[in-house]
């Protein structure tokens, strides 16, 4: 596992996504897992993008 540095705005968005999932009946732990996995995928894909 690795650390992802998020801006405050990105952190807020992640919290909102977790809250939305919980509002749909998903447990907090599962919601956190879902959002964390999505963030890792985004971060991994960003790392693969060639730098200009």
From Swiss-Prot:
> What family, per the record?
Belongs to the UPF0181 family.
Q: What is this protein called?
A: UPF0181 protein CGSHiGG_01050
Identify the species of origin.
Answer: Haemophilus influenzae (strain PittGG)
Its ancestry begins with: Bacteria, Pseudomonadati, Pseudomonadota, Gammaproteobacteria, Pasteurellales
